[in-house]
Each structure stands twice: as C-alpha cells, then as structure tokens.
C-alpha cells in the first residue's frame, strides 16, 4: 500500500503590521503603494457626543440606557404638544365666555345647515315602552288607584267633591284635639275557601292523634284477653286445680 507524500510548504510570508487603530470605516481610504501591501488610512475618530444633561452616564451600555430612568429636574416643564391625548389648554381670561354672552347652540343632528330638516339624517322615532311593560305599569296604576279609593271611603264609593280650603284655626290648649276614630267600610266581602275534606282532616290530625288511637286499641285488646283468661285465674278455678293435682296418680 503506497503512502501518500505530504507536500512541503515553505515558510509563510509575514504580513507587515498596519498602523495602530486603523480600522476600515466609511471615512477610511485604502491606498496601495508599489511593491508593498495596501495601507488603510482611516479618518481621525470623532469625539463621542457629550451625555445629555440629566441623562444616564456614558459608561452605561445601550440596553441600560433604554431601561434606565433618570429623574428630570423640577425646572423642566412638560410640553403638552408631545402628548396627543392631552386636554386643550385653557383659554385666556378675556377669551372665556361670560355669563352675559349667550353660548352658541349646536343644531340638532336632524337639522340641516339652514335650520330645516336634513335629508341625510332620518327623523328620530318617539320612545315607546314594550307592550308587556306598558301593561304592567297600567295594571299597577289601576291597583294603586283602587287602594286610594278604598282608604278614602271604601271601594266603589264616589270621590267627595272638592271643598274650598278653609284657613286652619290654631289649636288652643283649652280645646284639646279630638282623637281619631276608626271607620269601618260599609262594603264587606266574603271569600269562600274551597279545600279538600281529606286534606283538611289530615291537617287537623297529628302525632298526638295517632298515639291516642294506639292507646285505645291497646286497652281494647287487653280487655278482650282479660274476659277470656279472667275466669281461669279466679279462686274457684285455683281450688279445682289443686284438688285435681292432689288426686291419685295416673297409672301408666
């Protein structure tokens, strides 16, 4: 297997160093001289701009300058023109409208420039309540009117005629005011309530009724048992039982 021969390269030609701080920039010029390397001639570096008054120090990086907040001096006034949403400046005292001078009234949206109707704006429709709300308000108003009539002198009674107002006499301590009397309405309403008899009966009954029925049933059953067993436990029945036991024994 043949080995590959490595090519021998001679020593590299050293590159002459350029001037210190020569960096090709937009203001630099590249010139070449015969039998020599190109030389970069850069313009003198411009001095950095002085930091603004009250701004961040020049040692801060660009990122820190964007996020660093330096308090402004109290003498600087904010310019309202820099803010688009700022309110308009207040007018001068002589330009302010006075109370005597009438303010110009803006025409309604449906009026034209001459005061007539503007065909571009349709006339506004009158406000109308929904049907259900109107019905509810009407029923409520009628109910309140009936309540007023009932409180005044009974339901269905005609309203008393309006009497001219008489001057009120001042009450003296010698004549005490008459106490108010209770007036009953001459119109009486009777409302019949229809209920199920079984539901009313069950409502009248309760746990006490069930316990009373159980006690009565227990007494009745005890009396029936005493009527059957009572004669067997009397003195005569005991004597007969003892005489039967004292007799001759039963033969097997």
UniProtKB/Swiss-Prot annotation:
Skewed-composition ranges (Acidic residues): 74-84
Region (Interaction with host PPP1CA): 179-192
Motif Bipartite nuclear localization signal, residue numbers: 204-222
Sequence repeats (start-end): 162-164, 165-167, 168-170, 171-173, 174-176, 177-179
Sequence segments annotated as region (Required for nucleolar localization): 1-17
GO molecular function, one term: protein serine/threonine phosphatase inhibitor activity
GO CC field: host cell cytoplasm; host cell nucleolus; virion component
Amino acid composition bias (Polar residues), ranges on this chain: 25-36
Entry keyword set: Host cytoplasm, Host nucleus, Host-virus interaction, Inhibition of host autophagy by virus, Inhibition of host innate immune response by virus, Inhibition of host interferon signaling pathway by virus, Inhibition of host RLR pathway by virus, Interferon antiviral system evasion, Modulation of host PP1 activity by virus, Repeat, Viral immunoevasion, Virion, Virulence
InterPro entries: PPP1R15
Stretches the record annotates as Binding to PP1CA: 179-192
Region (6 X 3 AA tandem repeats of A-T-P): 162-179
Skewed-composition ranges (Pro residues): 46-59, 85-94, 120-129
BP terms from Gene Ontology: response to endoplasmic reticulum stress; symbiont-mediated suppression of host autophagy; symbiont-mediated suppression of host innate immune response; symbiont-mediated suppression of host translation initiation; symbiont-mediated suppression of host type I interferon-mediated signaling pathway
Record region (Interaction with host EIF2S1/EIF-2ALPHA): 222-237
Subcellular location: Host cytoplasm; Host nucleus; Host nucleus, Host nucleolus; Virion
Region (Important for interferon resistance) residue spans: 194-252
Region of interest called Disordered, as start-end residue ranges on this chain: 1-129, 150-179
Signal peptide: none
More about this protein: ICP34.5 is detected as early as 3 hpi prior to viral replication but reaches maximal levels late in infection. ICP34.5 gene is therefore classified as gamma-1 or leaky late gene.
Family: Belongs to the PPP1R15 family.
Subunit structure: Interacts with host PPP1CA to form a high-molecular-weight complex that dephosphorylates EIF2S1/eIF-2alpha. Interacts with host EIF2S1/eIF-2alpha; this interaction is crucial for the specific dephosphorylation of EIF2S1/eIF-2alpha by PPP1CA. Binds to proliferating cell nuclear antigen (PCNA), which may release host cells from growth arrest and facilitate viral replication. Interacts (via N-terminus) with host C1QBP and PRKCA. Interacts with protein UL31. Interacts with host TBK1. Interacts with host STING/TMEM173; this interaction inhibits the intracellular DNA sensing pathway.
Matches recorded under PANTHER family: GH11727P (PTHR16489), PROTEIN PHOSPHATASE 1 REGULATORY SUBUNIT 15A (PTHR16489:SF14)
Record remark: domains: The triplet repeats region may play a role in modulating virus egress.
Name of protein: Neurovirulence factor ICP34.5
